[in-house]
Amino acid sequence: MARARASAMGAAPPPHLRSHDLVVVVAVAAAALCLACRGASAGGGGGVDVLDRARRPEFAAWMAGVRWAIHERPELAFEEIETSRLVRAELDAMGVAYRHPVAGTGVVATVGTGRPPFVALRADMDALPMQEEVQWEHKSKVAMKMHACGHDAHTTMLLGAARILQERRHELQGTVVLLFQPGEEVGTGARRMVEAGAVDNVEAIFGFHVSVELPTGVVGSRPGPLLAGCGFFEAVITGKGGHAAHPHASVDPILAASTVVLALQGLVSREADPLEAQVVTVTRFLAGDALNVIPESITIGGTFRVFSNEGFLRLKRRIEEVIVAQSAVYRCAAAVDFHAGGRPLLPPTINSAALHAHFQAVAAETLGASAAVLGAMEPCMGSEDFAVFSEAVPASHFYFVGVRNEAEGLVHLAHSPHFRVDDAALPYGAALHASLAMRYLDERRREGGSHPHEEL
Protein backbone atom coordinates (compact mmCIF):
# COMPACT_ATOMS: atom_id res chain seq x y z
CA MET A 1 0.00 0.00 0.00
CA ALA A 2 2.82 2.37 0.82
CA ARG A 3 4.55 1.87 -2.51
CA ALA A 4 1.30 2.02 -4.44
CA ARG A 5 0.50 5.31 -2.76
CA ALA A 6 3.88 6.75 -3.68
CA SER A 7 3.52 5.69 -7.31
CA ALA A 8 0.02 7.07 -7.57
CA MET A 9 1.27 10.46 -6.48
CA GLY A 10 4.06 10.37 -9.06
CA ALA A 11 6.77 9.94 -6.45
CA ALA A 12 9.51 7.38 -6.81
CA PRO A 13 9.53 4.95 -3.90
CA PRO A 14 11.99 6.24 -1.29
CA PRO A 15 15.22 4.22 -1.38
CA HIS A 16 15.05 3.33 2.32
CA LEU A 17 11.72 1.47 2.19
CA ARG A 18 11.61 -2.30 2.36
CA SER A 19 9.74 -4.52 -0.09
CA HIS A 20 7.44 -5.90 2.58
CA ASP A 21 5.75 -2.56 3.34
CA LEU A 22 2.44 -3.96 2.03
CA VAL A 23 2.52 -6.76 4.59
CA VAL A 24 3.34 -4.27 7.33
CA VAL A 25 0.48 -1.96 6.38
CA VAL A 26 -2.02 -4.82 6.33
CA ALA A 27 -0.86 -5.83 9.80
CA VAL A 28 -1.10 -2.22 10.94
CA ALA A 29 -4.66 -1.95 9.64
CA ALA A 30 -5.67 -5.02 11.64
CA ALA A 31 -4.04 -3.60 14.76
CA ALA A 32 -5.77 -0.28 14.17
CA LEU A 33 -9.17 -1.98 13.97
CA CYS A 34 -8.49 -3.66 17.32
CA LEU A 35 -7.29 -0.39 18.84
CA ALA A 36 -10.31 1.49 17.51
CA CYS A 37 -12.66 -0.97 19.19
CA ARG A 38 -10.78 -0.69 22.47
CA GLY A 39 -10.72 3.09 22.24
CA ALA A 40 -14.43 3.30 21.53
CA SER A 41 -15.27 1.15 24.52
CA ALA A 42 -13.02 3.23 26.76
CA GLY A 43 -14.32 6.56 25.53
CA GLY A 44 -10.82 7.71 24.65
CA GLY A 45 -9.90 10.41 22.15
CA GLY A 46 -8.12 10.00 18.82
CA GLY A 47 -9.14 8.47 15.55
CA VAL A 48 -10.07 9.87 12.18
CA ASP A 49 -12.15 12.61 13.85
CA VAL A 50 -8.91 14.19 15.08
CA LEU A 51 -7.60 14.41 11.53
CA ASP A 52 -10.95 15.79 10.38
CA ARG A 53 -10.60 18.51 13.00
CA ALA A 54 -7.08 19.39 11.87
CA ARG A 55 -8.13 19.49 8.20
CA ARG A 56 -11.07 21.84 8.66
CA PRO A 57 -10.46 25.00 6.60
CA GLU A 58 -10.24 27.31 9.61
CA PHE A 59 -7.82 25.04 11.48
CA ALA A 60 -5.64 24.31 8.44
CA ALA A 61 -5.51 28.00 7.50
CA TRP A 62 -4.48 28.91 11.05
CA MET A 63 -1.63 26.38 10.97
CA ALA A 64 -0.44 27.57 7.57
CA GLY A 65 -0.44 31.16 8.82
CA VAL A 66 1.61 30.21 11.87
CA ARG A 67 4.17 28.39 9.74
CA TRP A 68 4.44 31.27 7.30
CA ALA A 69 5.06 33.72 10.14
CA ILE A 70 7.83 31.52 11.56
CA HIS A 71 9.29 30.86 8.11
CA GLU A 72 9.51 34.55 7.24
CA ARG A 73 11.50 35.32 10.40
CA PRO A 74 13.92 32.40 10.89
CA GLU A 75 16.15 32.43 13.94
CA LEU A 76 19.30 30.41 14.56
CA ALA A 77 20.04 28.10 17.49
CA PHE A 78 19.32 29.69 20.89
CA GLU A 79 18.31 32.92 19.15
CA GLU A 80 14.65 31.84 18.76
CA ILE A 81 13.32 34.87 20.65
CA GLU A 82 10.50 35.86 18.29
CA THR A 83 9.65 32.23 17.51
CA SER A 84 9.36 31.51 21.22
CA ARG A 85 7.23 34.62 21.69
CA LEU A 86 4.90 33.46 18.90
CA VAL A 87 4.62 30.01 20.49
CA ARG A 88 3.73 31.51 23.86
CA ALA A 89 1.17 33.85 22.31
CA GLU A 90 -0.56 30.93 20.62
CA LEU A 91 -0.51 28.90 23.84
CA ASP A 92 -1.94 31.88 25.72
CA ALA A 93 -4.77 32.11 23.18
CA MET A 94 -5.54 28.42 23.77
CA GLY A 95 -5.38 28.74 27.54
CA VAL A 96 -2.49 26.27 27.76
CA ALA A 97 -0.14 26.61 30.73
CA TYR A 98 3.59 26.70 30.07
CA ARG A 99 7.02 27.32 31.57
CA HIS A 100 9.52 29.76 30.01
CA PRO A 101 12.40 30.23 29.59
CA VAL A 102 13.72 26.69 29.48
CA ALA A 103 17.19 26.14 27.99
CA GLY A 104 17.27 29.78 26.96
CA THR A 105 14.42 30.22 24.50
CA GLY A 106 12.61 26.91 24.99
CA VAL A 107 9.02 26.48 26.15
CA VAL A 108 7.54 23.56 28.10
CA ALA A 109 3.73 23.43 28.09
CA THR A 110 1.34 20.97 29.73
CA VAL A 111 -2.20 19.87 28.91
CA GLY A 112 -4.33 17.49 30.96
CA THR A 113 -4.77 16.54 34.58
CA GLY A 114 -1.36 17.68 35.83
CA ARG A 115 -0.91 14.19 37.24
CA PRO A 116 0.74 11.02 35.88
CA PRO A 117 1.21 9.36 33.58
CA PHE A 118 3.26 11.99 31.74
CA VAL A 119 3.89 11.64 28.00
CA ALA A 120 5.89 14.20 26.00
CA LEU A 121 5.70 15.53 22.44
CA ARG A 122 8.70 17.41 21.05
CA ALA A 123 9.34 19.89 18.23
CA ASP A 124 12.45 21.93 17.42
CA MET A 125 12.37 25.63 16.52
CA ASP A 126 15.72 26.78 15.09
CA ALA A 127 16.69 27.63 11.51
CA LEU A 128 19.89 27.30 9.47
CA PRO A 129 22.50 29.92 8.45
CA MET A 130 21.85 29.84 4.70
CA GLN A 131 20.17 31.96 2.04
CA GLU A 132 16.76 30.83 0.80
CA GLU A 133 16.49 30.54 -2.99
CA VAL A 134 12.80 29.64 -3.19
CA GLN A 135 10.81 32.47 -4.74
CA TRP A 136 7.44 32.52 -3.00
CA GLU A 137 5.24 34.87 -1.02
CA HIS A 138 6.58 33.83 2.39
CA LYS A 139 10.27 33.58 1.59
CA SER A 140 12.66 34.29 4.46
CA LYS A 141 12.95 38.00 5.10
CA VAL A 142 16.25 37.63 6.97
CA ALA A 143 19.47 37.44 4.98
CA MET A 144 21.45 34.20 5.38
CA LYS A 145 18.85 32.58 7.61
CA MET A 146 16.35 29.98 6.42
CA HIS A 147 14.08 27.25 7.73
CA ALA A 148 15.65 24.68 5.42
CA CYS A 149 15.07 21.70 7.71
CA GLY A 150 11.35 22.08 8.39
CA HIS A 151 11.52 23.19 12.01
CA ASP A 152 8.91 25.85 11.23
CA ALA A 153 6.59 22.99 10.28
CA HIS A 154 7.54 20.99 13.39
CA THR A 155 6.71 23.92 15.67
CA THR A 156 3.44 24.54 13.85
CA MET A 157 2.40 20.88 14.01
CA LEU A 158 3.06 20.78 17.75
CA LEU A 159 0.99 23.93 18.22
CA GLY A 160 -1.75 22.22 16.21
CA ALA A 161 -1.49 19.18 18.48
CA ALA A 162 -1.65 21.48 21.51
CA ARG A 163 -4.89 23.01 20.24
CA ILE A 164 -6.47 19.59 19.64
CA LEU A 165 -5.38 18.36 23.06
CA GLN A 166 -6.63 21.49 24.81
CA GLU A 167 -10.03 21.14 23.13
CA ARG A 168 -10.19 17.56 24.45
CA ARG A 169 -8.40 18.11 27.74
CA HIS A 170 -11.26 16.66 29.78
CA GLU A 171 -10.78 13.34 27.97
CA LEU A 172 -7.09 13.07 28.84
CA GLN A 173 -6.17 10.35 31.30
CA GLY A 174 -2.96 12.03 32.43
CA THR A 175 -0.72 14.87 31.27
CA VAL A 176 0.81 15.69 27.89
CA VAL A 177 4.08 17.65 28.05
CA LEU A 178 4.77 19.81 24.98
CA LEU A 179 8.45 20.55 24.36
CA PHE A 180 9.31 23.47 22.07
CA GLN A 181 13.06 22.97 21.84
CA PRO A 182 15.77 25.43 20.77
CA GLY A 183 19.14 24.59 19.29
CA GLU A 184 18.65 21.26 17.53
CA GLU A 185 20.89 22.21 14.61
CA VAL A 186 23.89 22.65 16.91
CA GLY A 187 23.10 19.41 18.72
CA THR A 188 22.90 20.80 22.27
CA GLY A 189 19.29 21.93 22.65
CA ALA A 190 17.86 18.63 23.83
CA ARG A 191 20.56 18.15 26.46
CA ARG A 192 19.96 21.63 27.83
CA MET A 193 16.22 20.87 28.00
CA VAL A 194 16.94 17.66 29.90
CA GLU A 195 19.29 19.47 32.28
CA ALA A 196 16.54 22.04 32.91
CA GLY A 197 14.20 19.27 34.04
CA ALA A 198 11.91 19.42 31.02
CA VAL A 199 11.33 15.65 30.98
CA ASP A 200 11.54 14.85 34.68
CA ASN A 201 9.02 12.06 35.44
CA VAL A 202 8.09 11.72 31.74
CA GLU A 203 7.77 8.02 30.91
CA ALA A 204 7.43 8.20 27.12
CA ILE A 205 8.27 10.75 24.43
CA PHE A 206 7.43 11.10 20.74
CA GLY A 207 9.30 13.22 18.19
CA PHE A 208 8.98 13.71 14.45
CA HIS A 209 10.66 15.21 11.40
CA VAL A 210 9.31 16.17 8.01
CA SER A 211 10.68 14.17 5.08
CA VAL A 212 10.64 15.11 1.42
CA GLU A 213 11.36 11.46 0.61
CA LEU A 214 7.79 10.60 1.67
CA PRO A 215 4.74 12.01 -0.14
CA THR A 216 2.33 14.19 1.80
CA GLY A 217 -0.07 11.94 3.68
CA VAL A 218 2.52 9.24 4.31
CA VAL A 219 4.20 8.67 7.67
CA GLY A 220 6.85 6.14 8.55
CA SER A 221 9.30 4.81 11.10
CA ARG A 222 10.83 1.56 12.33
CA PRO A 223 11.51 -0.22 15.62
CA GLY A 224 15.06 -0.25 16.95
CA PRO A 225 17.83 1.88 15.39
CA LEU A 226 16.41 4.62 13.15
CA LEU A 227 19.07 7.35 13.09
CA ALA A 228 22.80 7.00 13.61
CA GLY A 229 24.88 8.22 16.48
CA CYS A 230 27.06 11.09 15.29
CA GLY A 231 30.47 12.32 16.29
CA PHE A 232 32.99 14.77 14.87
CA PHE A 233 36.76 14.76 15.16
CA GLU A 234 39.50 17.27 14.48
CA ALA A 235 43.19 16.44 14.65
CA VAL A 236 46.26 18.64 14.51
CA ILE A 237 49.25 16.69 13.21
CA THR A 238 52.54 18.44 13.93
CA GLY A 239 55.93 17.82 12.32
CA LYS A 240 58.78 20.18 11.48
CA GLY A 241 58.45 22.80 8.79
CA GLY A 242 61.09 23.53 6.19
CA HIS A 243 61.93 24.20 2.58
CA ALA A 244 60.21 21.93 0.07
CA ALA A 245 63.54 21.44 -1.73
CA HIS A 246 65.03 19.83 1.40
CA PRO A 247 62.36 17.44 2.73
CA HIS A 248 65.01 15.42 4.59
CA ALA A 249 65.56 18.40 6.87
CA SER A 250 61.88 18.54 7.74
CA VAL A 251 59.25 16.27 9.28
CA ASP A 252 56.41 16.32 6.79
CA PRO A 253 52.94 16.40 8.44
CA ILE A 254 51.20 16.29 5.06
CA LEU A 255 52.63 12.84 4.32
CA ALA A 256 51.60 11.67 7.79
CA ALA A 257 48.08 13.07 7.38
CA SER A 258 47.70 11.45 3.97
CA THR A 259 48.40 8.02 5.41
CA VAL A 260 46.04 8.76 8.30
CA VAL A 261 43.17 9.39 5.88
CA LEU A 262 43.81 6.06 4.16
CA ALA A 263 44.19 4.17 7.44
CA LEU A 264 40.90 5.51 8.79
CA GLN A 265 39.04 3.85 5.93
CA GLY A 266 40.21 0.49 7.21
CA LEU A 267 38.22 0.98 10.41
CA VAL A 268 35.02 0.36 8.47
CA SER A 269 36.22 -2.06 5.80
CA ARG A 270 38.37 -4.26 8.04
CA GLU A 271 37.28 -3.80 11.66
CA ALA A 272 33.51 -3.29 11.58
CA ASP A 273 31.07 -6.18 11.34
CA PRO A 274 29.81 -6.08 7.72
CA LEU A 275 26.26 -6.34 9.10
CA GLU A 276 26.72 -3.23 11.25
CA ALA A 277 26.68 -0.07 9.13
CA GLN A 278 29.34 2.51 9.97
CA VAL A 279 30.72 5.62 8.30
CA VAL A 280 34.03 7.44 8.79
CA THR A 281 34.44 10.42 6.48
CA VAL A 282 37.33 12.91 6.42
CA THR A 283 36.00 16.29 5.31
CA ARG A 284 38.80 18.68 6.28
CA PHE A 285 42.46 18.73 5.17
CA LEU A 286 44.09 22.10 5.81
CA ALA A 287 47.81 22.91 5.68
CA GLY A 288 50.19 25.71 4.61
CA ASP A 289 49.88 28.47 2.01
CA ALA A 290 53.25 28.57 0.22
CA LEU A 291 53.92 26.06 -2.54
CA ASN A 292 57.61 25.77 -1.66
CA VAL A 293 57.25 25.30 2.10
CA ILE A 294 56.57 22.13 4.08
CA PRO A 295 54.22 23.36 6.81
CA GLU A 296 54.78 22.87 10.52
CA SER A 297 51.38 21.27 11.00
CA ILE A 298 48.18 20.19 9.29
CA THR A 299 44.59 20.01 10.51
CA ILE A 300 42.29 17.22 9.42
CA GLY A 301 38.76 16.50 10.54
CA GLY A 302 35.55 14.73 9.75
CA THR A 303 32.60 12.79 11.10
CA PHE A 304 31.72 9.24 12.09
CA ARG A 305 28.33 7.53 12.31
CA VAL A 306 27.16 4.21 13.78
CA PHE A 307 23.87 2.68 14.98
CA SER A 308 24.82 1.28 18.39
CA ASN A 309 26.24 2.87 21.52
CA GLU A 310 28.85 0.11 21.79
CA GLY A 311 29.95 0.56 18.19
CA PHE A 312 30.02 4.32 18.63
CA LEU A 313 32.39 4.21 21.58
CA ARG A 314 34.61 1.60 19.91
CA LEU A 315 34.87 3.62 16.69
CA LYS A 316 35.65 6.82 18.60
CA ARG A 317 38.48 5.08 20.45
CA ARG A 318 39.93 3.56 17.28
CA ILE A 319 39.84 6.86 15.37
CA GLU A 320 42.08 8.45 17.98
CA GLU A 321 44.39 5.44 18.13
CA VAL A 322 44.84 5.35 14.35
CA ILE A 323 45.49 9.08 14.02
CA VAL A 324 48.08 9.14 16.81
CA ALA A 325 49.84 5.91 15.82
CA GLN A 326 49.90 6.54 12.09
CA SER A 327 51.28 10.05 12.63
CA ALA A 328 54.02 8.61 14.82
CA VAL A 329 55.13 6.32 11.98
CA TYR A 330 56.22 9.49 10.15
CA ARG A 331 57.75 11.10 13.28
CA CYS A 332 54.80 13.46 13.82
CA ALA A 333 52.76 14.15 16.93
CA ALA A 334 48.96 14.26 16.83
CA ALA A 335 46.31 15.73 19.12
CA VAL A 336 42.70 14.63 18.54
CA ASP A 337 39.68 16.67 19.67
CA PHE A 338 36.16 15.21 19.58
CA HIS A 339 34.52 18.43 20.80
CA ALA A 340 36.09 21.05 18.51
CA GLY A 341 33.85 24.05 18.05
CA GLY A 342 31.56 22.85 20.82
CA ARG A 343 30.19 20.04 18.70
CA PRO A 344 28.51 17.36 20.82
CA LEU A 345 28.62 13.61 20.46
CA LEU A 346 25.07 12.44 19.73
CA PRO A 347 23.93 8.89 20.53
CA PRO A 348 21.91 6.86 18.02
CA THR A 349 18.13 7.27 17.95
CA ILE A 350 16.71 3.88 18.90
CA ASN A 351 12.93 3.42 18.88
CA SER A 352 11.13 1.42 21.54
CA ALA A 353 9.54 -1.66 19.94
CA ALA A 354 6.43 -1.22 22.09
CA LEU A 355 6.04 2.44 21.16
CA HIS A 356 6.59 1.60 17.51
CA ALA A 357 3.70 -0.86 17.62
CA HIS A 358 1.66 1.90 19.28
CA PHE A 359 2.70 4.33 16.53
CA GLN A 360 1.70 1.94 13.75
CA ALA A 361 -1.73 1.24 15.17
CA VAL A 362 -2.53 4.84 16.11
CA ALA A 363 -1.26 6.20 12.78
CA ALA A 364 -3.40 3.78 10.79
CA GLU A 365 -6.46 4.60 12.87
CA THR A 366 -5.91 8.37 12.92
CA LEU A 367 -4.91 8.94 9.31
CA GLY A 368 -7.39 6.39 7.96
CA ALA A 369 -7.78 5.62 4.28
CA SER A 370 -6.35 8.99 3.28
CA ALA A 371 -2.80 7.99 4.13
CA ALA A 372 -0.37 5.11 3.90
CA VAL A 373 1.58 4.06 6.97
CA LEU A 374 5.09 2.80 6.41
CA GLY A 375 6.29 0.57 9.19
CA ALA A 376 9.64 -0.71 7.93
CA MET A 377 11.84 2.22 6.92
CA GLU A 378 15.53 1.54 6.53
CA PRO A 379 17.81 3.17 9.12
CA CYS A 380 19.31 6.51 8.10
CA MET A 381 22.85 7.76 8.70
CA GLY A 382 21.50 11.18 9.65
CA SER A 383 21.39 12.07 13.34
CA GLU A 384 19.09 13.94 15.73
CA ASP A 385 19.57 15.29 19.23
CA PHE A 386 16.16 13.80 20.03
CA ALA A 387 18.35 10.82 20.95
CA VAL A 388 19.35 12.70 24.10
CA PHE A 389 15.71 12.60 25.23
CA SER A 390 15.78 8.88 24.46
CA GLU A 391 18.52 8.44 27.04
CA ALA A 392 16.63 10.45 29.67
CA VAL A 393 13.14 8.95 29.18
CA PRO A 394 12.30 5.24 29.64
CA ALA A 395 10.62 4.89 26.22
CA SER A 396 10.92 6.98 23.06
CA HIS A 397 9.82 6.96 19.44
CA PHE A 398 10.77 9.12 16.44
CA TYR A 399 8.97 9.12 13.10
CA PHE A 400 8.78 10.92 9.75
CA VAL A 401 5.93 12.92 8.21
CA GLY A 402 5.90 13.14 4.42
CA VAL A 403 5.93 16.61 2.81
CA ARG A 404 6.77 15.73 -0.81
CA ASN A 405 4.47 17.21 -3.46
CA GLU A 406 5.82 16.69 -6.98
CA ALA A 407 2.93 18.56 -8.61
CA GLU A 408 4.03 21.70 -6.74
CA GLY A 409 7.74 21.04 -7.22
CA LEU A 410 8.29 20.43 -3.50
CA VAL A 411 10.97 17.77 -3.95
CA HIS A 412 14.22 19.32 -2.67
CA LEU A 413 15.95 17.70 0.29
CA ALA A 414 16.36 19.34 3.68
CA HIS A 415 19.32 21.73 4.03
CA SER A 416 18.89 22.74 0.38
CA PRO A 417 18.27 26.45 -0.34
CA HIS A 418 15.34 25.22 -2.45
CA PHE A 419 13.70 23.18 0.33
CA ARG A 420 10.02 23.88 0.93
CA VAL A 421 7.34 22.13 2.99
CA ASP A 422 3.90 21.18 1.65
CA ASP A 423 1.43 22.96 3.95
CA ALA A 424 -1.09 20.20 3.26
CA ALA A 425 1.06 17.97 5.49
CA LEU A 426 0.55 20.12 8.59
CA PRO A 427 -2.80 18.55 9.63
CA TYR A 428 -1.31 15.04 9.40
CA GLY A 429 1.51 15.84 11.80
CA ALA A 430 -0.72 17.74 14.24
CA ALA A 431 -3.41 15.05 14.32
CA LEU A 432 -1.00 12.15 14.65
CA HIS A 433 1.08 13.79 17.37
CA ALA A 434 -2.05 14.55 19.41
CA SER A 435 -3.48 11.07 18.87
CA LEU A 436 -0.25 9.33 19.89
CA ALA A 437 -0.36 11.12 23.24
CA MET A 438 -4.09 10.64 23.84
CA ARG A 439 -4.00 6.95 23.05
CA TYR A 440 -0.87 6.44 25.12
CA LEU A 441 -2.56 7.92 28.19
CA ASP A 442 -5.68 5.82 27.57
CA GLU A 443 -3.61 2.66 27.33
CA ARG A 444 -1.62 3.43 30.47
CA ARG A 445 -4.74 4.09 32.52
CA ARG A 446 -6.30 0.82 31.36
CA GLU A 447 -3.12 -0.99 32.34
CA GLY A 448 -3.43 0.48 35.83
CA GLY A 449 0.30 1.15 36.02
CA SER A 450 1.87 2.58 39.16
CA HIS A 451 2.88 6.23 39.18
CA PRO A 452 5.43 7.03 41.89
CA HIS A 453 5.72 10.68 40.82
CA GLU A 454 2.55 12.64 41.42
CA GLU A 455 3.71 15.88 39.80
CA LEU A 456 5.81 16.80 36.79
Swiss-Prot record:
Annotated InterPro entries: Amidohydrolase, Bact_exopeptidase_dim_dom, ILR1-like_Hyd, Peptidase_M20, Peptidase_M20_dimer
GO cellular component: endoplasmic reticulum lumen
Keywords: Endoplasmic reticulum, Hydrolase, Signal
Listed SUPFAM superfamilies: Bacterial exopeptidase dimerisation domain, Zn-dependent exopeptidases
A Pfam family the protein falls into: Peptidase_M20
Motif (Prevents secretion from ER): 453-456
Superkingdom of the source species: Eukaryota
EC number: 3.5.1.-
Subcellular location: Endoplasmic reticulum lumen
Gene3D superfamilies reported in the protein's UniProt record: 3.30.70.360, Zn peptidases
Signal peptide: 1-42
Alphabetized NCBIfam families for the sequence: amidohydrolases
Protein name (database record): IAA-amino acid hydrolase ILR1-like 2
Gene: ILL2
